[in-house]
Amino acid sequence: MKKRLLPCLTLALLLALALAGRAAARTVVTTTTNLPTIQISVPSTANVYINPNRLPVQLTASTETAQIISSPCYIENLSEVPVRVHVEATGSARGGISLVGETTAGSTSKAKRVFMYFEIQAGVDPDDVTWDNEYDADSHIVIRDGDTKTKNSMVILGSAEHEKRYGVFRLTGDCIEEPTEAWNSRDSVTVRIVFTFTPLPVDTEIP
């Protein structure tokens, strides 16, 4: 009987040795998200002129005669990636001004109505920008009194090393030239503009 048990014992030992030769180990992989640092130069203030009689107004590099004129302003992308620019604008009228949602050109109103809108263009040279000829609801933001308007994806700016890294913006529009109550120095509009930026892939095509 002892001899018959030997093969079974030998097989059991071989299995035990084979199992003992197996080992397990694990690797823990930690993922880190590499996010770009967004750095944009944004002016803190700007000047807007209400110019009902279309008098010549001397700006930095030109003389303007429009009814709504703003000093030249621009943001500059100093980031390592392109950015998409979203804009939020809120108006606040003083004096007898009423901020309206459509042009006053051809209007017979005698109220102090002002039609003002925000425009931004991506450019190579902040001193040389081609502006739109007229208001476009799809591209511009109308300024309303106490009402915040938001428009997403207004422009895409190239990275700091790209020539088209400037977002040049202005406030423009028109107003009633001769209201019943004459224009005076107390009539003014303050506009609060907030920019928000979304980083884009480095190979994004810049329009």
Task: List the model feature ranges, each with a label.
Residues 21-81, 95, 177-207:
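Short, polar/proline-rich extracytoplasmic segments that appear immediately after membrane translocation
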Residues 26-30, 55-142:
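Surface-exposed interaction patch
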Residues 64-67, 134-192, 201-206:
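Exposed beta-sheet edge/beta-hairpin loop segments within beta-rich domains
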Residues 2-3, 129, 181:
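Short, low-complexity intrinsically disordered segments
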Residues 1-2, 20, 111, 142, ...:
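Intrinsically disordered, low-complexity sequence elements enriched in Ser/Thr/Gly/Pro
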Residues 1-30, 73:
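Gram-positive cell-envelope targeting signals
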Residues 113-116, 167, 193-195:
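Short non-domain terminal segments
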